[in-house]
């Protein structure tokens, strides 16, 4: 096959374009084809997905196909989509094909890597277990993140997934001096713009690469943008031996984009109309996110749960790949308990005495025990009132309410809305605080003293102020 073979457009069906080539000049699967859109005068990239016979291929467009027509000349680049990787990409914002979209000059000091790569082999992968401190109490205590693991943020619309992701980026950049890659997959353009400006303001942009394929873009762009960001993260792991964070907001939109193009590619839909290749598509992305002996990629994925139905195939398929799940609760958000992480539904494989240590494990389980007992008692309280409880149960309810409030925490990225300075709490302080509440050391303090504070010492200070007032 000649490297720059040329073909012609046969058919355009929305984001799917069929292209015919000469005998013996067919491109390979995942090759990038280029066509000049006569309406805009710009180059459009098509990615080959299927060979459909008669020397024709079926491709998915990575930008709008408005203006394309039959007979237009298409050129095969002979290689997959390549994106810029390396130090020169830090602090910049790209689209799915690696073009800068921040209005600055061209990217310098970078290499170009293809977005389709094989996962590291079993022998290259690391098996050591290490905890990544996030500085967010509820996460560090109840759903600790493994370094090089995959973490899912589950929640419906408007419960604070994106704010939590932004706070983690800030904490990793400032407290750990780490690099972060952010893939905006099918989310609001306004949020992407806010994220960029907030990161500029917080001075964390220089340690981050942003890659966007937003809601207004065709499904092809949304389907591939996570791979573009992952490729950039792989460079820092494999070449520079760094520990990198990869944020994907939102992994559900990645599945959604795949299902949009799947039917147009002629595949029979499966359960709830999703693509039959759902597990494969997810596996190709997730298997590349791992720790090697050189470095690690820790991935935090916001997962929209359609209609709050956790059994939907999209979130259910994602579950199988995760090491920790952080479930955001609408009930806690309604009570103003932010971050609205559900302490009973959120789990982590790392919450094991052999990994986090006996003290951490016992405190975490003690907290969950008290909260579960409080949850069991809520029906009795609603019907008969607090007076009907035993003295022991009354004490459990009081401690549970303090724990619930102490699990809340002011975040740096929401300072300008809340006017409360953000707090970063080390794991040791988190464990000490909850241990002392469980021991009954603060049974005499008002529960409001524990709301929106960092360490337990701040809660004691707040209690003194409340008593004076």
Swiss-Prot record:
GO molecular-function terms, A-Z: ATP binding; ATP hydrolysis activity; proton-transporting ATP synthase activity, rotational mechanism
Ion transport among keywords: yes
Location of the protein in the cell: Cell inner membrane
UniProt EC number: 7.1.2.2
InterPro entries linked to this entry: AAA+_ATPase (IPR003593), ATP-synt_VA_C (IPR055190), ATP_synth_F1_bsu (IPR005722), ATPase_a/bsu_AS (IPR020003), ATPase_alpha/beta_chains (IPR050053), ATPase_F1/V1/A1_a/bsu_N (IPR004100), ATPase_F1/V1/A1_a/bsu_N_sf (IPR036121), ATPase_F1/V1/A1_a/bsu_nucl-bd (IPR000194)
Catalytic activity reported: ATP + H2O + 4 H(+)(in) = ADP + phosphate + 5 H(+)(out)
Pfam families in the record: ATP-synt_ab, ATP-synt_ab_N, ATP-synt_VA_C
Residues holding ATP: 155-162
Keyword annotations from UniProtKB, A to Z: ATP synthesis, ATP-binding, Cell inner membrane, Cell membrane, CF(1), Hydrogen ion transport, Ion transport, Membrane, Nucleotide-binding, Translocase, Transport
Subunit structure: F-type ATPases have 2 components, CF(1) - the catalytic core - and CF(0) - the membrane proton channel. CF(1) has five subunits: alpha(3), beta(3), gamma(1), delta(1), epsilon(1). CF(0) has three main subunits: a(1), b(2) and c(9-12). The alpha and beta chains form an alternating ring which encloses part of the gamma chain. CF(1) is attached to CF(0) by a central stalk formed by the gamma and epsilon chains, while a peripheral stalk is formed by the delta and b chains.
Function: Produces ATP from ADP in the presence of a proton gradient across the membrane. The catalytic sites are hosted primarily by the beta subunits.
Family in the record: Belongs to the ATPase alpha/beta chains family.
Protein name: ATP synthase subunit beta
Source organism per UniProt: Thermosipho melanesiensis (strain DSM 12029 / CIP 104789 / BI429)
